[in-house]
Every structure is written in C-alpha cells, then in structure tokens.
Amino acid sequence: MIIVRDTLLKKKNSINGKILKININNSDYEIISMGHRNPQGLFFDKENNFILETEHGPKGGDEINLIELNQNKIPNYGWPLASAGEHYRSTELKYKNYPLYKSHKEHGFIEPLISFVPSIAPSEVTKISNNYYVAGSMRNKSLRFFQLDNDKKIINLTRVEVFERVRDIIYRENKLYMFLEDTASIGVIDVSQF
C-alpha cells in the first residue's frame, strides 16, 4: 500500500528508498543516501568520490542526483515529500501528507543536479571522459550528454536523439554501447570527441 511504503522510506532502519553499500563478503550494508523514489542508474566515480544516480519521479520530476560519499550524516533527496513532479490521481494517497515541495533545499533535502518535467524516464548513467557523463532515456528515446563544473553543477547539457528506448548503456574504449528496447538491438556510438 502506498502510504505504508512511503512511511518506510522515511525510516532510517528500513532499506526502502535508500542507496546501499553492501559488503559482498558478509552481506552487511551501510546506507549511502535516502529519499529516493525509483532509482534506475548508478555510476560510482572513483576519481571524484561520488555516485551519480538517475531516478524516475512521479508524474514528471525525473532526476539526476549527485551523492557525495563519506559524509557525516546520510543525505536525504526528499522523496516522498519533495519532487518537481506531480501526484498521479489516486484515492489511496493522502496528498496533504505528501505535498511534493518543488524546492528540495528549502525543506532540508538535497536538490537534484537536474529535474526533468515532463518526464524523460532516465535509465543508466556513466562517465565517458575526464568530466563528461551520459544518461540514457527511455521515454525520450535519447541520450543526455553533460559535464560537471568545479562546483559539481551540470553544464553543456546536450540531447542526442536515438529514436528508441535506451534501456542501458556501457562505455568502453571511446565507444558507447546502447541496449535498445524497441528493436531488441545494440547501438554503438563513437564518443571519442568528448
């Protein structure tokens, strides 16, 4: 039930809505971040010690988040209280309990790097060069290339049409491999210019 699930998201002893670091030797885990609605892609940037995360919002409000590691407290990205999206019509959800604040920061949450309204249905995210990244999109049937500046803000955001749902992406040796859903095929793009 929606209300039970969303209540679990806010509890620190629940794993709902959390990004976890799992010890593969003993299955112990540590909560890296919380307040996530529907994570789709994760990329650990070892060089810069952060995680990029793509996330589906409700009706709109898809996000790319930057999760700083080794913080003193667990960062909260706001769900189910903050989102650039809107509620779906539902008799189960009590909207007054879940207002979907448009500003995350004003309510004590971490702002996304970017929110997409209307929804683009982001998929995987990966790094393709020194500080260039790319995220796939299922609804928008495209790729989003972007850089992060010294303040870790998105710059040079560029949309490249693919005309198919991009389910997953992998970067290897100046090539971006796209796992395309509409035709169950693999697309390859030379990204050596980045």
Stretches with model-predicted labels:
Residues D168-F194:
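Blade-level signature of beta-propeller repeat domains, shared across WD40, Kelch, NHL, RCC1
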Residues N23, T158-V160, D190:
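Ser/Thr- (and often Asn-) enriched beta-sheet segments in non-cytosolic proteins
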Residues S123, K152-E173:
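Conserved blade-ending motifs and adjacent loop-strand segments that build the rim/top face
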Residues I67, L93-Y95, D149, R159, ...:
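Generic preference for flexible, low-structure residues
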